């Protein structure tokens, strides 16, 4: 039964509303693919929190426009309050990827043109908190890749931001992406721990930090060099160096998705023949020259004694629930291991 799998879920975030909706006059009806009460009834926990996520990858314009002035921040915040009042949601999750740059448009709008956003990010949060009050939840999705963390935050802005945020969901996945040129685990233990420690060392309280899990698989085309070693070897060029356009040499699919036809043969080799080091699960297909990276239930479970427990983190989250359907094998693992963690 699906209800058994979700019995331990405490927070559900509905993604996404576009950030630009909150810049001007509020719409007569907020664009949500479902309604909060319908979602609430699907989950057993009486005190389930349902949040609305704003933004997501590639959606930065509304955040930038709001952050640029005090008037813009105030309007943005008041519209978020209106949306929460109208939908009955328990809070808002801000997915600005990312203040300061390194987003989808990083080749079109340089990081230097967006550097001003770093300093005003806490000001935007302050305005939203003032508008929605202390009883509504406000969280943020934040990057896990070191180069993105460095662009988005300073220690001072993180410390100030945490005055207003209830918690941060640290995206400890996609830690290898098409901008890289050597293979690595996309959600490994070591690179996840580096991300977590970066936030903890820069002012994020452990109890407000959540570790992210990926319910999907990633693949990357490589050079012949990977025949010598699959990790740390060169990939082919995966992104246009001038435009940032995806060259189709990497990708992802979830456990719920149909495996793309052109990848099916390779992935069917990868699953039973996967390698595991102390950091994570991977496979290199010598015939197709494809590097695969994904979390198995076993590798997910290892992140608790390696990261969650010693760092005393507040929780864990996954992107995203539907991506683990219909078997929910990875969700079951998170539930079981987190229950054990809570007893320690």
What would you call each of these model-derived segments?
Residues 1-84, 331-336, 343:
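Glycan-recognition patch characteristic of GH18 chitinases/ENGases
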Residues 9-10, 46-50, 88-92, 134-136, ...:
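Short, well-ordered coil/turn segments that N-cap beta-strands
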Residues 12, 52, 94, 128, ...:
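Conserved, mostly hydrophobic/aromatic
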Residues 55, 91-99:
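Mobile, glycine-rich extracellular loop/lid and propeptide segments
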Residues 33-40, 77-84, 118-129, 158, ...:
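Generic structural signal for well-ordered alpha-helices
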Residues 22-31, 99-260:
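Substrate-binding surface in catalytic domains of secreted glycosidases
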Residues 1-8, 67-86, 146-160, 292-309:
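Short, acidic/polar
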Residues 54, 213-306, 333-343:
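Glycan-binding loop/region signatures in secreted carbohydrate-active enzymes
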